[in-house]
Amino acid sequence: MDKDLSLDNLRKKIRSNEFTKATSGYAPGYLQANLVILPALWATDFLLFCQKNPVACPLIDVTQPGERYLPSIGADIDLSRDVPEYHVFYEGNFEASVPDLTELWQDDLVTFVLGCSFSFEEALIQSGLSIRNIDDGKNVSMYDTNIACQPAGKFDGNFVVSMRPFTPKDAIRAIQITTRFPKSHGAPVHFGDPSVIGISDIAKPNYGEAVHINSDEIPVFWACGVTPQNVIRQSRPPFCITHAPGKMLITDRLSSEFAVL
């Protein structure tokens, strides 16, 4: 089965561009990460932005300019090749999706590795909770919101959130479990009425895919590592690269290493 791929085999398939799908449900137990890659002149401001917004942008590590490797997350990880799909922005505008960064890499680029909510999915599943998008074989639903980030330097904007539906009973358990994973966005930022956080139509996510919400379920929203992409569109750095929403870097680190409590 596809989702039974070992981490090594999955990474090989990603690096060879054989695997280009969303990574939710893959490599259970391993920390998945968002990427933001910026010119060094913009890196200090973005580092401050992460420090001021740890729920939306939980910083795992950051590289030196030009470095494509980060031993703290994996000895063999190549940040320019080991994501299923990258998004390229110029002046804050989305320009292209690319399978790797071989032709785009520059010596002044600084890579920020940010935690992802996919990392706590195994803990939810092991506790007996079902995750709708994984069960349906879909990417997670993600939405722009009216929740403001704390501005820092050149960077400002609003949260993006991911959504998973649960019954009220299961939602309480999900809150308890995910609180243990602050480096994967931690506890939800909202549950219930989507309009309170500026979502007008829950059936039309801004990123990812829609999932069905049963009549006895409520939507539960976590901060999402697509937030920087929203901020980039507003802050307009001259050049930026990110992961494609839902298509993450899978590290060698276990999610449990970053758990608390």
Swiss-Prot record:
SUPFAM superfamilies to which the protein is assigned, alphabetical: PSTPO5379-like
Pfam families: D-Glu_cyclase
Superkingdom of the organism of origin: Bacteria
GO MF term list: lyase activity
Matching Gene3D superfamilies: PSTPO5379-like, PSTPO5379-like domain
Keywords noted in UniProt: Lyase
Enzyme class: lyase
Family per record: Belongs to the D-glutamate cyclase family.
HAMAP family: Hydro_lyase
PANTHER family given in the database record: D-GLUTAMATE CYCLASE, MITOCHONDRIAL (PTHR32022:SF10)
Name of protein: Putative hydro-lyase VSAL_I1435
Annotated source species: Aliivibrio salmonicida (strain LFI1238) (Vibrio salmonicida (strain LFI1238))
